[in-house]
């Protein structure tokens, strides 16, 4: 009790009073007197072999030995013939952590790659198989039935093999497409034609009235015009399409003559001379 009182004093940070020290001495003397009487009664009437200066642990050890228990020096106590496998104290608050293999690890969210799990191992050799292959497992690779199905997960997408096609139907060439016009010419010669532009007058300040160009509406060069239809090259050429200048025939009651570009007037369908 003196040691305990000193420990509590150091913990509280104050010195016990004289009255408290006297009370602690009285309790300690009473405890020792009661223990001495118990030890004397056990020695005389119980035939216990207890040392002269013993404590409560010696008494407990003697009681266990009388009851047929085994008590070691470190305090391990058990019945005869039933040695415990674990040295855990039932009243202890210490809990042993379970081993790492006590609980099964959860299944991972990803799946194994087919490149590593589908191909059989070289050790899987069947003696009944043909020996024509240099390596035994090459025969397993040759048959497509041994390949495991591809397992795909949402969390880990699997890249398809390089040899797999990118789409189910191959793309047809452009010339085999149904939208390609059949009536288009098979020869690209129509791109070589240079279309004739409308003759324009020189509107610069240096030009005069007489320097304007004159348009001839009687002769037209057929070879310089664009083809009349997409099937122009598919039809046999006539005499008029060889490149010969052909004169335009007037209708009945119509007169064709050369007209200057400046003499033409845009009337938008109305005759201005008739109004005047």
Curated annotation (Swiss-Prot):
Region (Disordered): 1-30, 76-125, 155-191
GO CC field: plant-type vacuole
PTM summary: Phosphorylated. Phosphorylation increases protein degradation.
MF-aspect GO terms: DNA binding; DNA-binding transcription factor activity
Keyword Transmembrane annotated: no
InterPro entries with a match to the protein in the record: BES1_N, BZR
Presence of the UniProt keyword Manganese in the record: no
Region spans: Required for DNA-binding: 14-87
One biological process term in Gene Ontology: DNA-templated transcription
Keywords: DNA-binding, Phosphoprotein, Transcription, Transcription regulation
Ranges of Polar residues composition bias in the record: 84-103, 175-189
Ranges of Low complexity composition bias in the record: 104-122, 164-174
Modified residues (Phosphothreonine): 159
Protein name (record): BES1/BZR1 homolog protein 1
The organism of origin for this protein: Arabidopsis thaliana (Mouse-ear cress)
């Amino acid at each position: 009790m003196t040691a305990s009182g000193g420990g509590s004093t150091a913990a509280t940070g104050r010195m016990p009073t004289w009255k408290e020290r006297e009370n602690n001495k009285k309790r300690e003397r009473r405890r020792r007197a009661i223990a001495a009487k118990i030890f004397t009664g056990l020695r005389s009437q119980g035939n216990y072999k207890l040392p002269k200066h013993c404590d409560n642990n010696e008494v407990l050890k003697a009681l266990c030995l009388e009851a047929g228990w085994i008590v070691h020096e470190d305090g391990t106590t058990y019945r005869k013939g039933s040695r415990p496998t674990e040295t855990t104290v039932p009243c202890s608050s210490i809990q042993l952590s379970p081993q790492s293999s006590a609980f099964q690890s959860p299944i991972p969210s990803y799946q194994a790659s087919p490149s590593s799990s589908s191909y059989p191992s070289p050790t899987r050799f069947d003696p009944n198989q043909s020996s024509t292959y240099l390596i035994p497992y090459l025969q397993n690779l040759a048959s497509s039935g041994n390949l495991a199905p591809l397992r795909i997960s949402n969390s880990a997408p699997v890249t398809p093999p390089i040899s797999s096609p990118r789409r189910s139907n191959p793309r047809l060439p452009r010339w085999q497409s149904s939208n390609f016009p059949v009536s288009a010419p098979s020869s690209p010669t129509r791109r070589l034609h240079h279309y004739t532009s409308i003759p324009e007058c020189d509107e610069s300040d240096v030009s005069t009235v007489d320097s304007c160009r004159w348009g001839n509406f009687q002769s037209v060069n057929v070879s310089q015009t664009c083809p009349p239809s997409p099937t122009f090259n598919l039809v046999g050429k006539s005499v008029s399409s060889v490149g010969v200048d052909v004169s335009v025939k007037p209708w009945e009651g119509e007169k064709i003559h050369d007209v200057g570009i400046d003499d033409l007037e845009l009337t938008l369908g109305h005759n201005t001379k008739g109004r005047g």
